[in-house]
UniProtKB/Swiss-Prot annotation:
Keywords: Glycoprotein, Membrane, Phosphoprotein, Pyrrolidone carboxylic acid, Sialic acid, Transmembrane, Transmembrane helix
Subunit text: Homodimer.
Highest taxon listed in the record's lineage: Eukaryota
Phylogenetic classification of the source organism: Eukaryota, Metazoa, Chordata, Craniata, Vertebrata
Membrane-crossing residue ranges in chain numbering: 50-72
Name this polypeptide is given: Glycophorin-A
Species the sequence originates in: Equus caballus (Horse)
């Protein structure tokens, strides 16, 4: 049993052949005792492996475009502008010497040389 769907009928026409067209999808039902509304399947022009390859290709294309955009944006953010020199680092590195204070009296050190309580 085949159910054809198509455009609404044209006013004044009752011929079923003018309602359906060649581009209209055809729905078929399986004859296993189920009601007509259950299990409608669309008749495809392609086989199942071809449809699977098409879907996987579209998914790979979308994922590839997303990865390409992420790569390009990462490369553009890394490059500093050619006219502006790179900013000096404000974070001291491990190899850099500690900053020297001009006031030696108030500078703090981690090692004490004399004890204030020792009065000999």
């Amino acid at each position: 049993q085949t159910i054809a769907t198509g455009s609404p009928p044209i006013a004044g026409t009752s011929d079923l052949s003018t309602i359906t067209s060649a581009a209209t999808p055809t729905f078929t039902t399986e004859q296993d005792g189920r009601e007509q509304g259950d299990g409608l399947q669309l008749a495809h022009d392609f086989s199942q492996p071809v449809i699977t390859v098409i879907i996987l290709g579209v998914m790979a294309g979308i994922i590839g475009i997303i990865l390409l955009l992420a790569y390009v944006s990462r490369r553009l953010r890394k490059r500093p502008p050619a006219d502006v020199p790179p900013p000096a680092s404000t974070v001291p590195s491990a190899d850099a010497p500690p900053p020297v204070s001009e006031d030696d009296e108030t500078s703090l050190t981690s090692v004490e040389t004399d004890y204030p309580g020792d009065s000999q």
